[in-house]
Amino acid sequence: MKTILGIHRSPHAHWVGDGFPVRSLFTYDNLASKISPFLLLDYAGPHDFTSTSARRGVGQHPHRGFETVTIVYQGELEHRDSTGAGGLIGPGDVQWMTAANGIIHEEFHSPGFARTGGTLEMVQLWVNLPARDKRAAAGYQTLLAEDIPVVALDGEGGSLRVIAGEYRGHSGPARTFTAMDVWDMRLHAGATVQLPVAAGRNAALVVLRGNVRINGEREAGPASLVLFDRAGEDVAVEALEGASLLLLSGEPIDEPIVGYGPFVMNSQAEIAESFDDFHTGRFGQMQDARDGAAH
């Protein structure tokens, strides 16, 4: 069993642009070695928006050196980027964007969702890239809900979606640069599940909704992060009520992390170079782009 290193909770939300009230459950600023290859996770909502004809969200902004993973639970988003990719991301869908050598993108509530209003709930996860891949070509993967395997958990305890990696012979559709698992789970009240996590991997359990007991020891509630030691295998989760969770595990990238704003590289010199490349147009450009705050 993996040892629990700590439980962190983020009760306070802040706004990203005018469309995303988020709670930052972890960042590389203070947990880098314990969460690698993951860098950051923001949990937005659930938040009710009234109908509007205005665009809500975040206008064009750059990224370099990592990937962003957006998981939508409720609501609908519209994405566009400088590679020409784009589209709608609805409930159950996942957007896996590789910034790598540089990308410019924007994220807004979709016109349909803005027009009707409703509840928005989503997660954005940042995934680091090893130094050898930080200058790879930018890319974009749309992972539709119907293409993500759903596995029934033992004892009718709930379900697990394999977004990345593998679970009991079911492989997720996301293409990753390093070995990792990203599992999206729903547990029924009273269910207990044993999750296989390899020794040597960093692992974190993200509790989005509900209350759970971990390894029979400690309880964690909504909007909280449970960190585990690299040693040991398996994590036991008991749902004290219906719960929504993410299990993140991966082989650590034991390299220097230097981040500033939308860039995550390995040195200050690379950060300075990234700003210069962005300002001189080396990230490409978007048609009909709109200014906005960075996320």
PLM region spans:
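Jelly-roll (double-stranded beta-helix
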Residues: 1-295
